[in-house]
Amino acid sequence: NAIYDKGHLLSSISNARLFDEFCKIFLGGLGEKNFNKLCSFNLNKHLVISDPDESDFSHNIMIQALRNTDDRIKNNQSVTPGFLLAALLWPKLISRCIKNNEINIRKFFRSMDGVLREQQKLTAVPRKFNSYIKDIWVLQLKLHSRIKSQPYKIIRHPRFRAAYDFLLVREKASFDKNGLGKWWTDFQKNDDSLRGSLIARINEKSDTDSSKKFGFYNELR
């Protein structure tokens, strides 16, 4: 089969050209189908450094992110390669900072640039998307913690909506039922008394170990 025999030639194509191909393949409304086809020929490694076969979660979040992107396109909603890359690279990022089924926050921050540099070798991601991707990643920490009045600041962040959408993708890919996504869905409602009660409940639990842990259970296995 020519695809199997010649697939290695993709590594000789410029990373700028491959970024263009990344956008055409994954941002045209058939991203999930195209990704599955690439995986069947073992060609996905030429476009994304994350390996969908590394874990069930890796596979789930990559598929869920692509499905989410396809759905947005069908609904005439905006899409950006920055959001998709934030999701596709997430398994690679967290795999570098997990210890004893917990994410080491210091390693989390130290690993971000390294992951992006590795992806850059495959696809020349425009610099403007690097800060976008890192904002989405860092906001995941804050979306989990919800310390005191922090949620009020988070919803004013220019990347909040993208970070919230990514949280829902992670939650779905993890099959998590603890309601973090719903908490943020409810918090966005313009109701001060509801927001106050939501925060009060979190602050009551702030001294428990579970409230200080970051990440969904299946994400950390």
Feature names for model-found ranges:
Residues 19-22, 26, 35, 41, ...:
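Phenylalanine-focused residue identity feature
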Residues 50-53, 100-102, 177-184:
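Composition- and surface-driven signal marking solvent-exposed, interaction-prone regions
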Residues 54-59, 77-154:
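Extended, charged alpha-helical interaction scaffolds
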Residues 61-62, 112, 212-213:
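Detector for methionine-enriched segments
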Residues 5-19, 107-125, 186-197:
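Short, mixed-charge aromatic SLiMs
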Residues 1-99:
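Glycine- and charge-enriched loop/helix tracts that form the active or gating conduit
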Residues 46, 121-221:
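Charged substrate- and nucleic-acid-binding regions of tRNA-handling and nucleotidyl-transfer enzymes
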